[in-house]
């Protein structure tokens, strides 16, 4: 086993510490400031060699993974509480949200899953994890530790994870990691929901930049970000089912 100090140092390269040992588990942490860019910019995913954004008029269909709620004394009440929290997080993004969400137990794009036990390291415990835009099936995973947060912190955790679903990255994911590349669009002040600690708060600037990013991508005005092509993607329920059934379209946080 590595000495604890060495193990902690190595983990610094792998996890995104938000505050008080809270670490987002959706992506790894970046290191450098390519081309002298400030870390206070809107960062979007480019881990596949392109920037994936959702196609216009996309609706993501989700469902609960029922068996993951069976450990609750009242599974239906637990689902209702999570549904309310998820709805509040979506409402926080307001009309800047580039996609709609609808619950669908039959044909779904992602599941909301409650883990039965925490996932911890010397850096902290996972609160939640999400996914980036693509045509696969995914999970929005919530860990028990998230329910130990106070109300606003819990809400901000889900707002942050929904930011990943929209395609946003952490500030430290700024470009030049070959395995986890990102691209920069627009500018942010220090306070941002995709930033760290006390600065991890949803701002009007967050929403304005996200809205502008998608409007320009959908109109064709923006086709590349810093030389990396934008690719508009469709969800699983459109691309992952036989064509005759497809509906035509127009186009982790850890805590100590």
PLM regions and their residue ranges:
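Metzincin-family zinc-dependent endopeptidase catalytic domain
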Residues: 43-46, 80-187
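Second-shell loop/turn segments in exported
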Residues: 69-81, 141-149, 195-200
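Acidic glycine-/aspartate-rich tracts in secreted/extracellular proteins
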Residues: 67-69, 117-119, 169-172, 199-201, ...
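Post-HExxH zinc-binding segment in Zn-dependent metallohydrolases
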Residues: 171, 184-213
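Disordered inhibitory propeptide/activation segment of secreted metzincin zinc metalloprotease zymogens
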Residues: 1-81, 90-91, 181-185, 212-256
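Short hydrophobic-acidic sequence motifs that mark active-site Asp/Glu residues
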Residues: 61, 111, 193
